[in-house]
Structure formats: C-alpha cells, structure tokens
Amino acid sequence: MTVKTETAAGASTLTYSKMRGMVALLIAFMKQRRMGLNEFIQKIATNSSYSCKPSEVQSILNISPPQESELLNENSSPPPSHSQQINLGPSSNPHAKPSDFQFLKIIGKGSFGKVLLARHKADEKFYAVKVLQKKAILKKKEEKHIMSERNVLLKNVKHPFLVGLHFSIQTTSRLYFILDYINGGELFYHLQRERCFLEPRARFYAAEIASALGYLHSLNIVYRDLKPENILLDSQGHIVLTDFGLCKENIEPNGITSTFCGTPEYLAPEVLHKQPYDRTVDWWCLGAVLYEMLYGLPPFYSRNTAEMYDNILNKPLQLKPNITNSARNLLEGLLQKDRTKRTGAKTDFMEIKNHIFFSPIDWDDLINKKITPPFNPNVSGPSDLQHFDPEFTDEPVPNSIGQSPDSILITASIKEAAEAFMGFSYAPPMDSYL
C-alpha cells in the first residue's frame, strides 16, 4: 500500500512502513507529553510558592514536537515492539472524570462516604462508584489504608471472586473508586432474611471465599476483615469479595504483622491478645463466617463486646449436632485458638482446599464458574435494586458528586490532600482503548 503526498520538492511516495513509523513517533510524543503534563500539574498542586514562568514550561514538560523530516525519513526506525513500548503504569490516564458518569442511586454508605450506582455516559455501562471525602480520611489519618485499598484492587483483575477496579479518580475534595457493579445483595442481607443456610449452600460460598483468600495470600496480601457485610452475591449467585481497606500488603508466607484491626465478632484470639499474627487470621475469619452461615450467629457472639472478647479468648467452641462430621472437623480446625495449630497454618489455601468438607467441590469448575450456584438472586438487570436497603436507595443523590471542577484554587488543605493521595488516579493503559 502506498500514499501520494505533495511537498515543495515535488511528489513523494509514503509507504505503509513509513506511515507506521509516523504513528509510532506520534504515540511516543503524546505519551511523553502526558507524563510531562502530569509532573507539571503535581509540581504546581504541591508547591504554592512555585511560579510558572513561560521559559520553564518547555523544560518541565520535557518535550519537543517531532519534525516533518523525522516523520518522513526514508530510514525511520520501525515502530517499537509491544515489549519496547513505554509502560506508563497505573497512573493518571485522563480517560475518566466524575462528569463522565450519571449517578443514579445511593446503594451503600461507609465511614468516609457513599457507594453509588452510576452509568457511564459514553458506553452506558453500569458501575458501583465508591465516593470518599478526602477531608474525613485525613481527619482520621486513614490515607494509608485508602491507598492500600487502591493498590490491592489493582491486583484483583485476575480473580473471579474479587471485585474489580476500572478507574480510580480524584477531585480536590473527593476520591472515586469505579468498581464492578454487583447487585445480588450482601451475604449479610441474605443471612438476615433466611437466618442460616443448608450445608451444601454454605459449602459453596465457603469454597469461593477460600479461593479468593488463597489468591490474595498468593500475592502476599492478608485480607483481615472477612465478614458477611463484605461478601456480595453477583447476579448469578457467585460470591464477590469487596472492601479492601484493612488489607495488609507484603506479608510473606511466614511473615507477621501486629496492627489491631477488624470487626469484633470475627477477630482472632491472637489479634485480641495484641500479639503478632499472620495470614491464618483470614482462616479464623472463614471459620467464623462458615459457622454463622450454618448456625445464624458468629461463633462466640454476645451483645456485650467485652464478654464476646472473653468468649473468643477463653470459651471452648460449642457445636450443635445438626451438621456433618466433616463440617464439624473443619470448624474445629479453622476456629483453633492456637494459630500454629489452625487449619491453614501449614500449607495455607491448599490445606483448606484438600479438607474432606470440600470433597464434593471440583475446584477447577469452581474457579471457572461452571458450578451452578445454589441460590439465584433473580435480578432483572442493573436497575433492579431489590437487594439494596431502601434507606440508601431512597436518599437523593447530591448533584456535586458528578461534577468535575474546571478550575482549582490551591489552598493549604488541597495541597495537603494532593500530597496524601498522590498517585491515586488510575485508568487502564491507553492501548486498551485503541
């Protein structure tokens, strides 16, 4: 294929390979320009004393436009291979902003903000958008947990039972996680309605949860906050683990940590003792959730928190006779107060996977979602909100949530927030849009 172009020197032939060279140079130029702009903006946002001088702009952006002679050079280099292309990584790809979305309903609330159902205006896809107030996060000094949640979400793209992150964006006052929209309801909601589950249904959910936890552990991530409120059902009835704010990264197989965190009903004894703990805290929590699915309440529950803590530390596990021996054996292993003797302490997920309780599970079929879930939430589509609390869905959506400010007045608090959440923004690489 050839293309004729007219120049001052006369007609010249532009071959297909030359066109590819032009495209490669232009793409490299655009990417270089984008990186320079990002550095320039960050410098302004985090340094109020910085005065931008026209002579400095070119050096800060660090770009020079490709010349026509470069684009039409007979000996131009071939376009870079995929492995040679510049990898911008998970940072400020400008492909999403709040005003790109139509915010339809509030579907949940948390300590720092709301979760909303939103539709992307361009492709009309539905997302769950977690909107957090920077001021509230900074006030409670939780910025590290938020950034950790963002980092963990970026690693979840390969597992079917973990919620996926599509974009993370920010304005001067808010952070936005654009996530998979899951509308089958929380496991907590279904447990409240049905009180407890039959053993086959509990086994199915426990297997999918264990698979998700095992994947996180393979990435050296400890989840630390497993509870029915953080376990969603998708539209077919598969579980989806969400809310990674308490995850601890970089915990090797024999690594330990010591931060006191979690939800009272599901805290492991070693956490309550304020002792160093490892990834087996997640297997304790799995035992607590499995117990609750089978019996209707967490294993050592009391309305009095101090009494419940004492139960977790000192009271023997009591199991009613209406479960199978394999379920009993697994619960006794997972809810072992000595973490070194707990099921999962030796070979982590493999020990769970090979337990007799899960012998009916084909794990390959499970991970590929070939096993029909024992319960179908029967949602008619994305707008079906039957499994969300009307307390949330009836609340009006604030107009400000969908606004992308055109101009920014740099203040001390905005500068502090810019520094605290630097690198938060994420979009898929540009190649995925081409």
UniProtKB/Swiss-Prot annotation:
SUPFAM superfamilies: Protein kinase-like (PK-like). This is Serine/threonine-protein kinase Sgk1-B. It is an enzyme of class 2 (transferase). Residues 68-94 are annotated as: Disordered. Residues 359-434 form the AGC-kinase C-terminal domain. PROSITE patterns: AGC_KINASE_CTER (PS51285), PROTEIN_KINASE_ATP (PS00107), PROTEIN_KINASE_DOM (PS50011), PROTEIN_KINASE_ST (PS00108). ATP binds at I107, G108, K109, G110, S111, F112, G113, K114, V115, K130. The active site is at D225. Keywords: Apoptosis, ATP-binding, Cytoplasm, Endoplasmic reticulum, Kinase, Nucleotide-binding, Nucleus, Phosphoprotein, Serine/threonine-protein kinase, Stress response, Transferase. Gene3D superfamilies: Phosphorylase Kinase, domain 1, Transferase(Phosphotransferase) domain 1. It is found in: Cytoplasm; Nucleus; Endoplasmic reticulum. InterPro entries: AGC-kinase_C (IPR000961), Kinase-like_dom_sf (IPR011009), Pkinase_C (IPR017892), Prot_kinase_dom (IPR000719), Protein_kinase_ATP_BS (IPR017441), Ser/Thr_kinase_AS (IPR008271). GO terms for molecular function: ATP binding; protein serine kinase activity; protein serine/threonine kinase activity. SMART domains: S_TK_X, S_TKc. One of its GO terms (cellular component) is endoplasmic reticulum. The keyword Transferase applies. It comes from the Eukaryota. One of its GO terms (biological process) is apoptotic process. PANTHER family: RIBOSOMAL PROTEIN S6 KINASE. Belongs to the protein kinase superfamily. AGC Ser/Thr protein kinase family. Protein kinase that may play an important role in cellular stress response. Plays an important role in activating certain potassium, sodium, and chloride channels, suggesting an involvement in the regulation of processes such as cell survival, neuronal excitability and renal sodium excretion. It catalyses: L-seryl-[protein] + ATP = O-phospho-L-seryl-[protein] + ADP + H(+); L-threonyl-[protein] + ATP = O-phospho-L-threonyl-[protein] + ADP + H(+). Residues 101-358 form the Protein kinase domain. The keyword Endoplasmic reticulum applies.
